[in-house]
Each structure stands twice: as structure tokens, then as C-alpha cells.
Swiss-Prot record:
Its EC number is 2.1.2.1. Homodimer. It comes from Mesomycoplasma hyopneumoniae (strain 7448) (Mycoplasma hyopneumoniae). GO terms for cellular component: cytosol. Its main location: cytoplasm. It catalyses: (6R)-5,10-methylene-5,6,7,8-tetrahydrofolate + glycine + H2O = (6S)-5,6,7,8-tetrahydrofolate + L-serine. This is Probable serine hydroxymethyltransferase. The modification N6-(pyridoxal phosphate)lysine is found at residue 226. InterPro entries: PyrdxlP-dep_Trfase, PyrdxlP-dep_Trfase_major, PyrdxlP-dep_Trfase_small, Ser_HO-MeTrfase, Ser_HO-MeTrfase-like, Ser_HO-MeTrfase_PLP_BS, SHMT-like_dom. Belongs to the SHMT family.
Amino acid sequence: MYKKIKLRDQQISELINLESKRQNSQIELIASENYASEDVILANGTSLSNKYGEGYPGKRYYGGCTFIDQIEKIAIERVKKLFKIEYANVQPYSGSSANAAVFAALLKPGDKILGLDLNAGGHLSHGYKINFSGMFYSGISYFLDENELLDYEAIEKIALKTKPNLIICGYSAYSRKIDFARFRQIADKVNAFLLADIAHIAGLIAAGQHPSPVGYAHIITSTTQKTLRGPRGGLILTSSKEIAAKIDKVVFPGIQGGPFFHTIAAKAVAFKEALEPWFKEYCAQIVKNAAHFASEFIKKGIRIVSQGTENHLFTIDVLSSYNLNGKQAQILLESVNIITNKNTIPNDTLSPFVTSGLRLGTPAMTSRGFKEQEFSQMAEIIDFVLRKKELNALEIKEIKKKVKILTKNFPIKKSYWP
């Protein structure tokens, strides 16, 4: 496929090759990024891209759907087995699309959504004003306590006072485990639906490295590209036949047209991989690496939000630790081929475009084979760069050399994990 692109569109071909080289030559520490396997990438770039077919298996509005029906059925059965749940919709184009479908299925315009404050680790699609979820629904926030942990009693008080129609748990920058059972207790007290958005931790849940929301959340949404190592896409899970029927009607014809069958095939491949024994080892290593990585910074006196991690990510308070904002830290590290992202922290005083924090994650480099030793090296390099603030040409050259050795020893195409 890429060869044909090169022959017919040299400009795009060159940019694809440059991006591939960039990924291979840089250390990827963005918590929401990962490396899909060759099988997933191959499945995502097939003749399935040519096929259109609205509806669901056996109930399409177009002919010629024999094989795509089988593919979608396989994807559904695999993800149901993976999460031990009764119903699944694998058609959502993204995690935000999945959330939009849930809101449309269960809520009326103006209904109340209770989610974690964005600065504290929530997500735009959890009721934030500039997002559709805050435009069509009334977003209410809960917050972390003084130790930067979920305060379930405080959340319950807010819920009892505001009477939300939907409560969301599941985050983009929260490094501790979530008590889904406690959230369900809160939801039941106010007769609210409970949505678990597990976009970041889906792989960890499937591998038994984080408690599962199945049996507690009325409905579950996720992306497929993060810790699941699949293609970019979304999914919706539920144990309720009634909710499943509502979701199916909203996904199509409610908010989407024809599914991306090439992506559904790639999802199916990723789900199969996640059912393999090695995937549990991989996710266990993600968690070990993150805990070790965070502890290395803590030893150096660096402030980590909530003082550690129990999943795949953590956030450094770079403003108090290095007298840098998140944007400055991100740019500094990218200058030596280490890719991170600026991130807000609880009670952040800086704008989301600047931030006081820097979020770090271990899934991508764990995919390439990094273990505790390599993450110790990364902590040393990152700490040095952020303390120096201004690197001279020789220092930049030396650090880039260290990064090059690591990326060469742990290439993407020879990932430690199948």
C-alpha cells in the first residue's frame, strides 16, 4: 500500500516516511499513545476501506456485506470475552463518539452530568463547556481531596445536592485505582446512570491490572488505541439488554452512518492479541514501569501529583519542582527527542495551553521492551534536562546520543511484545 502511495503521491509518501522515522527515533512518553502491532496496522489498511454498509450484521442497508458481517461479529464476540460482558458495540469512531452515543441514548438535552474537574484529570467530553457534552448537557464537576485522590464522600455530597442524571468515572490524568463499586453506590442514591470511561485503562482492566467496572457501571466506553494497542477507534459495553438496544439505535442511525470496517477488523485483531497470555505480562510490566519511573522522580525530590501511580501514568508538577511550566518542559524534552505532553494539575493556576504539569506514561515504550532499568535512565535524562533549562550544543548532542542508543536497542518493529 505504501509503495503505491509513493509512486502516485510523493509528497504524502515522504511525510509518512518522515513520521515513521520520527516515531522510531524518539522516546514516546505520551500516556495516550502506543504502538499497534503490524497485524493491527495491516488489518487497518486493507480493501475493507472500500466497503460501505449502514446498520448491523444481518441488518444492513446495502448488499455485499457477507464478509464484513462476519468480521464485525468476530470483533463483538472477542471484546465481550475480553471484558466478560454481555453486550458490545464496536462501531464508534472514537472515544468521544462513544460518549456522545451514551449521552444521546440515556439523557435529554439539559440533563446533568457529574464528572471530574478537567484540571484534576477529567476529560473534555465529560461535561466541559467548550465540548458538545457541556453545550447540550449541564456539566457539574467533582474534585480531588488535599492528597489529590478521589474523595468519595465529597463526591456523594455533590451528587446528593445536584442530583445528576449521569455520573462519570474514568479519567485522562488520574494515576490511582478507581473504586467502581463505591461510585455505583453513589449513583444508586441519586438514581443516576453510572458511566465508566475506561479509555486510558482498558488494557489494564482486561489484563487484570486494574479493577473492572463490569457489574458496577451501567455502561462502559473506551478507545481502542491506548493500553489496548489497537487502531484509533471507540467501543461501548454494557450488561443491560435494554441499554444495549438504545445504544445500537443511537450509534446508527442516530449519530453515525457507515462503520469503518477496516478499523473494526483492526479492532478484532487487537482484541485477539489482548486475549493472549503475553498481553497480561505486557500490562503488568506497564504498571511496574510506571511505579518505578515515578519513584525515581520522587527520590530526587520532585513532586508527583498524588505522590505516585497505580496505573500507566503520572503527572509531574514541573512548576513547583523545576520552575518551568508544562509547555516549556514539553518543548525542552522534545529538543532532545523525548516526547511528552503538558498537562494541567489539580487547582492549576495556569491556562490549559501552558499548564503547571507534565504527564508521563509507560505503555508505548513498554511495547518496545523498556523495563525498569530503561525508565531509570529516562528519569535521569529528564531530570537533568529540566533542571538545566538551557542546554548547550554539546549537552544536546550527548543526550540525543543516549536517546538514539535506546531507540536503536528497542526499535518499534522488533517490539518485545508480539
